[in-house]
Amino acid sequence: MASKILLNVQEEVTCPICLELLTEPLSLDCGHSLCRACITVSNKEAVTSMGGKSSCPVCGISYSFEHLQANQHLANIVERLKEVKLSPDNGKKRDLCDHHGEKLLLFCKEDRKVICWLCERSQEHRGHHTVLTEEVFKECQEKLQAVLKRLKKEEEEAEKLEADIREEKTSWKYQVQTERQRIQTEFDQLRSILNNEEQRELQRLEEEEKKTLDKFAEAEDELVQQKQLVRELISDVECRSQWSTMELLQDMSGIMKWSEIWRLKKPKMVSKKLKTVFHAPDLSRMLQMFRELTAVRCYWVDVTLNSVNLNLNLVLSEDQRQVISVPIWPFQCYNYGVLGSQYFSSGKHYWEVDVSKKTAWILGVYCRTYSRHMKYVVRRCANRQNLYTKYRPLFGYWVIGLQNKCKYGVFEESLSSDPEVLTLSMAVPPCRVGVFLDYEAGIVSFFNVTSHGSLIYKFSKCCFSQPVYPYFNPWNCPAPMTLCPPSS
C-alpha cells in the first residue's frame, strides 16, 4: 500500500517533458508544474515556431513566461521522495526503478547501469544502446568466473609465497642460531686456549720461582754453616789469645794452620733476571691454528687397530683402540708396530692418538711400496738406532716419533740411502697427536692437539701407489698408545 502511494506521489512530481523528477519546478497559470530547464527550452521553441505563444504540454492552456512562479513546495516533496527508501524485506525493491517504479529489464551499455523502459525513453538515456538484462547477465557471470578464477590463483600464489617466506624465515633463523652457536663456541674455545696458556705460563713461572728459591735457600744454608764455623774459629782464637806464653806457643801451630786454611766459600750466584719472561701470545696465529685443526677434524674417521700379524710383544685392548708393548724376557723385539684396520685409497681422513704417558713412540701412515708384509721378529740383541732408520718414506713410512722422552724426530722425504733424522722442536710436548691424510694431494700432516692444533710437521708430494694404512708403534715403552674416538 505504501509503495503504491509513493508511486502515485512520484507521478505527481514527475516532469511531463523529461519524465524525470522535477528539478527547480516552476508552476504555470493552469496549475501544472515543469522543470525550469524543460520549460525554458519549450519557451524558446514556442517563440521561434508559434510567434511567441507558449502552452502547457499537459492541458494546452497558454501561459506567459513572465508569470511563472517557483514552486518550493514541490521541490521539497521531490527531495523527500528521493530520501525515501522502501523497506529491506520488500523483495521487489531491487527490480524496480527508483525514479519510475517500473521493472528494471534493460541495461544501458553507455552508463553501465540497469534501467526501466521509461528510463530508456528519458532524455538521460535517449540514443543509448540498451540490451535485456538476461543477455548481459550471462556475460557478467562469465566475466565474474574469470575474475574469480584469477583471484583464486592469486590467492594460491599468495599462500605459496607466504609459505616460502615462512620457510625462508625459519631457515634464516636457523642460520642465525647456528652462526651464533659457532661464534660462541669459537670464543669459548679461544677463552679456553687463553686460560690454558695463562696456566701454562703461571706454572712455568712457579717452577722457576721454586727452583730459584731453592737455590737461594741452599746458598743461605751454606752461608749459615760457614758463618757458624768462622764464629767458632774466632771464639777459639780469642780464647787462645788469653792463654799464657807457654800454652800459646805449644798449641800455636794448630790454630794458625786452621786459620790460614779456612776461606769463605761464596755461594753460586743466582741470576737476577727471570728466565721465563711472558710474552703475550699471537692471538691471530692461535686462531689460525685452531681453524686449521677444526677444518681437518671435519674428516675425522673411526680408526681401530688390526690384530692380524701382530708382533708377540704387542697387546691390544678388547675395543682394539689401545696397544701396549710388553717385554718378552730375555729377548728384545724388533717392534714392527700395528696397522689400522681401515685403509684409504682416496679422499681426506683424520684421526687422533693419545701418547700422553709414553716416553717413546712412532705414528703416521704406511703404504706398501714392495711386496713386504708385517711380520714379528724376536732377537736377542737389536740396534734400536738402526731399526729407527727403517721408518722413512723410502720404505713406505710417513711418520714422526719420540725417543728418549724428549727427542722428537722425523725422516725427511729423501730417497737417499743414508737419511738423517730431522729433529722437531716442541714448545709444548704433545700428549695428543692428530694425523691428517689427503690421498689425492699426497699430504700427511701432524698436529699437536695439546698445543691448540699447532702443526708439528707436514709431508707433501707423497707418492702413494697402494692403499694407505694408519700406523702405530708403541716402541719399547710400556705405557699405552690409544686411538681417540671421533670428536672426543
UniProtKB/Swiss-Prot annotation:
Catalysed reactions, semicolon-separated: S-ubiquitinyl-[E2 ubiquitin-conjugating enzyme]-L-cysteine + [acceptor protein]-L-lysine = [E2 ubiquitin-conjugating enzyme]-L-cysteine + N(6)-ubiquitinyl-[acceptor protein]-L-lysine
Alphabetically ordered keywords of this record: Antiviral defense, Coiled coil, Cytoplasm, Metal-binding, Mitochondrion, Repeat, Transferase, Ubl conjugation pathway, Zinc, Zinc-finger
Superkingdom classification of source: Eukaryota
Cellular component, GO annotation: cytoplasm; cytosol; mitochondrion
Zinc finger (B box-type): 92-134
Intracellular or extracellular location(s): Cytoplasm; Mitochondrion
GO biological process: defense response to virus; innate immune response; positive regulation of DNA-binding transcription factor activity; protein ubiquitination; regulation of gene expression
Pathway annotation: Protein modification; protein ubiquitination
GO terms of molecular function: identical protein binding; ubiquitin protein ligase activity; zinc ion binding
Keyword Zinc-finger assigned: yes
Binding site for Zn(2+): C97, H100, C119, H125
Pfam families: SPRY (PF00622), zf-B_box (PF00643), zf-C3HC4_4 (PF15227)
Coiled coil: 131-239
Record domain B30.2/SPRY: where: 283-488
Main localisation: cytoplasm
Annotated EC: 2.3.2.27
Phenotype upon changing R121E: Reduced association with TRIM5
ZnF bounds (RING-type): 15-60
Function statement: Functions as antiviral protein and contributes to the defense against retroviral infections. Acts as a capsid-specific restriction factor with the help of TRIM5 and prevents infection from non-host-adapted retroviruses. During influenza A virus infection, promotes programmed cell death by targeting ZBP1 for 'Lys-63'-linked polyubiquitination. In turn, promotes ZBP1 recruitment of RIPK3 to mediate virus-induced programmed necrosis. Negatively regulates the function of mitochondria by enhancing mitochondrial depolarization leading to cytochrome c release and mitochondria-dependent apoptosis.
Quaternary assembly: Homotrimer. Interacts (via B-box and SPRY domain) with TRIM5.
Similarity remark: Belongs to the TRIM/RBCC family.
Protein name: E3 ubiquitin-protein ligase TRIM34
Organism: Homo sapiens
